[in-house]
Amino acid sequence: MKSATRSATTAFFIPQETGAIRPIGGISKRSFDVLIAILALIALSPLFLLVMGLVKFSDGGSIFYGHRRIGHNGQTFKCLKFRTMMENGDRVLQEFFKSNPAAYEEWRTTRKLQDDPRVTVVGSVLRKLSLDELPQLLNIIRGEMSIVGPRPVVEDELELYDSAAEFYLRSRPGLTGLWQISGRNDVSYATRVAFDTHYVQNWSLLADLVIVFKTIPAVCLSRGSY
């Protein structure tokens, strides 16, 4: 019996009965992930609580936001973030696109907007400092994500990977990665795909450590974040 959350006709669906590929890094990478995630949650718990309060009291809405992403072997999971957008964000975005065709083209090609009308005041600060992604430490502990790896994508984005999608699917999506330390939104999507492919093809635990350490100045300087 197939165990998956998507239709068998989906291009990136990999049924478990075919012998799904184990994620890169094996037990050493998984042990590294769990250790770092637990230590980070403990160390950052005061900041975690502070952000929760800021998000809640800024507009009274929900604290967390979960969006379906494609994970290892094509299985979907709910990627967690602190909510940075208005609760009626989808409607706001569609109205914005009607009068801003250039913004729609930016969204269509990059899945990002430099001036996103949905983002709240508190949310813009959280995004700039990448604090909105802290809840993904819980995704890591649950085994849905890794500390280092390709950033989680939606199905439409994975189609942009074309033949390189197979490399994305070999790894758990990461909290950080080559893309984050190399300019993030300042680089093209094709370059992002190339980074992800290179990472998976050349994975090592040492490389993960280097990326983690390089993430700290990248986040502090807000390189390519918006």
UniProtKB/Swiss-Prot annotation:
What does the entry list under GO cellular component? Answer: plasma membrane
* Membrane topology of this protein: Single-pass membrane protein
* Membrane spanning residue stretches: 34-54
Entry's Gene Ontology BP terms: polysaccharide biosynthetic process
- UniProt keywords, alphabetically: Cell membrane, Exopolysaccharide synthesis, Membrane, Plasmid, Transferase, Transmembrane, Transmembrane helix
Tell me the pathway: Glycan metabolism; exopolysaccharide biosynthesis
UniProt subcellular location = Cell membrane
Query: Is ATP-binding included in the keywords of this UniProt record?
Result: no
Q: What does this protein do?
A: Needed for the addition of the first sugar (galactose) to the isoprenoid carrier. May function as a sugar transferase.
State the similarity comment: Belongs to the bacterial sugar transferase family.
Name listed for the protein in its UniProt record: Exopolysaccharide production protein ExoY
Natural source organism? Sinorhizobium fredii (strain NBRC 101917 / NGR234)
Q: What is the lineage of its organism?
A: Bacteria, Pseudomonadati, Pseudomonadota, Alphaproteobacteria, Hyphomicrobiales
